[in-house]
Amino acid sequence: MITLTGDLHPLEVLERLFSLKIEEPGNIILLRGNHELKETNRFEGLFRDLDHDEDLYARLNQVFDAMPVAAVISDKIFCVHGGIQRPVKLSDITKSGAYPYVWNDPSEENGINRSSRGLGMRTFGEDVLLEFLQLNGLERMIRGHSVVENGYRWWFGGKLLSLFSAFDHGGTGNGAAVAVVEGNGIELYNL
């Protein structure tokens, strides 16, 4: 099974991922990220990449609206693009409430705090994550969203993995990585 944690662009990548999802629907999970929100993708280049085709843009956003914001893999690992907003049951996570799950970031500071990313965005600390994991019988969380130097970063004593798979994002010189989950183990590979 392949799980991708959002920000599925440029168009060529998106096209390939949709093809894989059609070919292997039970083995590919595409999660919604902040670039799959209309409020973000119109100004981040998607509309331009579609040659300002309003109909195609609307249809593509309908697909994004149908995408899940989170998934659990191997029965113990919560996957999401951004983060969490507070300890909630998995059944309380909805597509209509996607914002924190595509925007929030982990922080060394405990609790829920304002994020430097902007208005309405928050950070969550180790205490919040541990309570969330315990409430849902989970062991770890894998998320994307944040550029990290080597393509991945472990947080909170190995309870959270930030994974980034795009090289040199925005000219930052960062590395890229992927994770392979088998059973309870996570193998990391730098690209």
Language-model regions, residue ranges each:
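Feature recognizes metal-dependent phosphohydrolase scaffolds
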Residues: 1-191
